[in-house]
Each structure stands twice: as C-alpha cells, then as structure tokens.
C-alpha cells in the first residue's frame, strides 16, 4: 500500500518572493500543500495567486512570532506593537495570556476565510509555537472544533509530555529538510527515516522561495532558494514514488 507524503511549504503570504517560490514548487515540483501567514506582508498577493491555482491545498500558518497581530495582544507585543521570538521567554516567565492567544487564533482563522474564500485545510504555526505546552491545548481544541487536522510533531510532543486528545494528523512530521546543507539526498534521507519508523503518513516541512527584499532580511535566506531548486528537480518526484510514497495533502488523511 502506498504511503502518504505531504510536502508542506510554510510561509505562504510572507512576501511575493516566498509566494512565487511556493507556486513554482507546487506547479513544477513536489510541494503538495502550503500554509498561509495571514498577517504577512504578502498575504493579499498569496490570496490572489491562490485563485489562479484553486487546486493548491492551503492551511493556516498561525503566527505569534512575526509581524503584527490582527488584534490587541499586550502580553506578547513589544513597544512597537510587533510580535517576536521573545514569546518563549515570556512563556517561561508565566506572562502569556492564553485568552489573547485564543482570540488571535480566531481572528487569523476568520481572516484566512475572508482572504481565501474557504476554510483552511489544516493548521500549523510559525516557528512551531503551537507545540509550546501552554499553547498546544487551545490550538488542538480549536482545530478539533473546526474539524481540521493539525500539524503534530509526535517526537516533540512526547519530549514535552503533551497530553494529546487524539488530534487528526500524520503519523510523522519531519522538519529536517532545513538549514545550510539542503540537497536531494537530505530529502530522501528524511524520507527513509520516517519509513524506518513505520510511518504510513508523513508531513515534510519546507520553505521554497525566490529572493526578495523581505527574504533577504530573514536569517533563513539563501537556503530557501536552494530548497526551491531541490524540490523542483526532475529526479525527486520519481525517487519519492520509487520509495512507495504518494504525494497528497491533509485532505487525504
């Protein structure tokens, strides 16, 4: 029996360069799903592109560490009203307002529906904030209330001793196709790792992009372009099929 592989491109809506990279990797490569940052500078552009490619499965990339929230979040923003990676520091200090986070999740979900004209296929998050122990239960409950699958790093959940309420997700999640050593060999190594663990469904995270002013400011910049090259390599799709995987989306779970 064929195993399900979801190659999900994160950060759709971050910028035009990111958006065009996602579309290129979907049209001419192995990307089979994406997740959108509705507070990103390229969110409107992403929505416009999605209307040209209605078959592209799009989920919600919940954001608590980038840009500005869609509503008031005094417990998380800095003096400029911006979100950032200080979320973890504030979480450790017990300074998170879960009510604010839940309300922002509702706002971003509603914004997604307004932008894309449909509900998301699933939910994940920028910088994996939904796997933070205080935040995870509310995101899981929200996804279940909406009848949506959720990205789940089961190894991380076990390490953090999260109490899972049987969320709909893949057997395995892999974030290892990332960094300065991106290659087709690395992608296939990550695939083999999941296969060895007996996963019947796997989500592989990626960030293919063309470079633009926004991407050039990112700490993770040029590897996005290398990811795009690898994900659109003519040999990769065949190699995936040879290993018994079928490309799909969270709608196939």
UniProtKB/Swiss-Prot annotation:
Biochemical pathway: Glycan degradation; chitin degradation
Entry keywords, A to Z: Carbohydrate metabolism, Chitin degradation, Cytoplasm, Hydrolase, Magnesium, Metal-binding, Polysaccharide degradation
Assembly and binders: Homodimer.
BP GO annotations: chitin catabolic process; diacetylchitobiose catabolic process; polysaccharide catabolic process
Keyword Metal-binding in annotation: yes
EC number: 3.5.1.105
Protein name in the entry: Chitooligosaccharide deacetylase
Example of a GO cellular component annotation carried by this entry: cytoplasm
GO molecular function per UniProt: chitin disaccharide deacetylase activity; deacetylase activity; metal ion binding
Gene3D superfamilies: Glycoside hydrolase/deacetylase
Reaction it catalyzes: N,N'-diacetylchitobiose + H2O = N-acetyl-beta-D-glucosaminyl-(1->4)-D-glucosamine + acetate; diacetylchitobiose-6'-phosphate + H2O = N'-monoacetylchitobiose-6'-phosphate + acetate
Binding site residues for Mg(2+): 61, 126
Predominant place of localization: cytoplasm
Biological function: Involved in the degradation of chitin. ChbG is essential for growth on the acetylated chitooligosaccharides chitobiose and chitotriose but is dispensable for growth on cellobiose and chitosan dimer, the deacetylated form of chitobiose. Deacetylation of chitobiose-6-P and chitotriose-6-P is necessary for both the activation of the chb promoter by the regulatory protein ChbR and the hydrolysis of phosphorylated beta-glucosides by the phospho-beta-glucosidase ChbF.
Keyword Zinc part of the UniProt annotation: no
Top-level EC class as recorded in UniProt: hydrolase
Protein family membership: Belongs to the YdjC deacetylase family. ChbG subfamily.
Cofactor(s) needed: Mg(2+)
Subcellular locations according to the entry: Cytoplasm
Pfam families assigned: YdjC (PF04794)
């Amino acid at each position: 029996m064929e195993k399900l592989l979801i190659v999900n491109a994160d950060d759709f809506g971050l910028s035009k360069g990111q958006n065009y990279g996602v579309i290129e990797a979907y049209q001419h490569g192995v990307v089979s799903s994406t997740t959108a940052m509705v507070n990103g500078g390229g969110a409107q552009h992403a929505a416009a592109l999605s209307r040209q490619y209605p078959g592209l499965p799009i989920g919600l990339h919940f954001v608590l560490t980038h840009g500005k929230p869609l509503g008031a979040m005094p417990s998380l923003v800095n003096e400029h009203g911006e979100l950032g990676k200080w979320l973890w520091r504030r979480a450790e200090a017990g300074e998170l307002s879960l009510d604010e986070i839940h309300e922002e999740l509702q706002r971003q979900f509603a914004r997604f529906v307004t932008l894309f004209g449909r509900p998301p296929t699933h939910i994940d998050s920028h910088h994996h904030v939904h796997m933070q122990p205080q935040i995870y239960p509310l995101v899981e409950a929200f996804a279940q209330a909406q009848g949506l699958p959720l990205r789940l790093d089961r190894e991380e959940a076990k390490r953090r001793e999260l109490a899972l309420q049987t969320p709909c997700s893949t057997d395995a999640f892999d974030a290892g196709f990332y960094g300065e050593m991106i290659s087709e060999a690395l992608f296939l190594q990550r695939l083999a790792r999941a296969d060895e663990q007996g996963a019947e469904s796997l989500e592989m995270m990626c960030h293919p992009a063309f470079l633009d002013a926004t991407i050039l400011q990112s700490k993770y910049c040029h590897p996005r372009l290398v990811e795009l090259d690898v994900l659109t390599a003519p040999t990769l799709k065949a190699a995936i099929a040879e290993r018994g995987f079928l490309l799909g989306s969270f709608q196939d779970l």
